[in-house]
Design a protein with these regions (language model features):
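N-terminal topogenic membrane-targeting module
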Residues: 1-65
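Membrane-proximal, solvent-exposed terminal domains/tails of membrane-associated proteins
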Residues: 10-12, 79-186
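Charge-rich, low-complexity amphipathic helices
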Residues: 46, 66-67, 164, 168
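Alpha-helix capping and helix-coil boundary motifs
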Residues: 33-37, 69-70, 78, 127
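Residues that form generic nucleotide/phosphate-binding pockets
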Residues: 23, 27, 48, 77-80, ...
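Short, solvent-exposed polar/charged micro-motifs at secondary-structure junctions
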Residues: 19-20, 70-71, 167-173
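Long, folded non-catalytic interaction modules
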Residues: 57-86
């Protein structure tokens, strides 16, 4: 079976008393196990989109890979994020300066059947001139894809939110490093 991979990463400044990171974590904790049906996945991703739409996104990265490398790309994104979360030292108690410069990183990845209506949605919505790939407007458009997908044609999906509870997230310098590979959006 041939697939297409779609991945989006967005980062926004972690602000004291801003509930967004907590709301994302609560959504994942509450709905992660119970979103196996097509309808449940549709509702879940609609809620993820609704939360991320309110985020003041500063950095981002995205990719659409169709064909032979799609499944490898999905697995690579997932394993790199999972291994970084597992090996990232606990940053609890870090300095106030670190906390004030910390970001929340949200990543969404999808593996869809090649040629399906979900794949066509990705093709239509990701047909963006290269000069516009890294703008806030483009990322708003990319996030809006989540609730549009027909999850009957989505073979795998995942969402990650870093940092976890009581931890500082990556800094702007870390986000643009080769480890993260994000770009400051225009």
């Amino acid at each position: 079976m041939a697939y297409s991979f779609f991945g989006v990463q967005v980062a926004f400044k972690r602000v004291a008393r801003d509930p967004l990171r907590g709301q994302l974590h609560d959504l994942l904790a509450r709905d992660a196990a119970g979103r196996q049906s097509v309808g449940a996945k549709q509702r879940f991703w609609g809620r993820v989109y609704a939360l991320l739409t309110n985020a003041p996104i500063e950095y981002g990265n995205w990719d659409l890979v169709r064909g032979a490398n799609a499944q490898d790309q999905f697995n690579e994104w997932a394993s790199e994020i999972e291994s970084s979360v597992a090996t990232d030292p606990d940053r609890a108690g870090a300095s106030a300066q670190r906390s004030s410069s910390s970001y929340v990183l949200a990543t969404a990845i999808f593996l869809v059947d090649r040629g399906s209506n979900a794949d066509q949605t990705l093709g239509n919505e990701c047909d963006i001139p290269e000069s516009e790939w890294l703008t806030r407007q483009t990322f708003a458009r990319l996030l809006a894809i989540f609730p549009q997908l027909n999850f009957a044609n989505v073979q795998a999906d995942a969402v990650y939110v870093v940092p976890g509870a009581d931890r500082d997230g990556p800094t702007a310098r870390e986000l643009i490093s080769p480890d993260y590979g994000l770009t400051l959006l225009s």
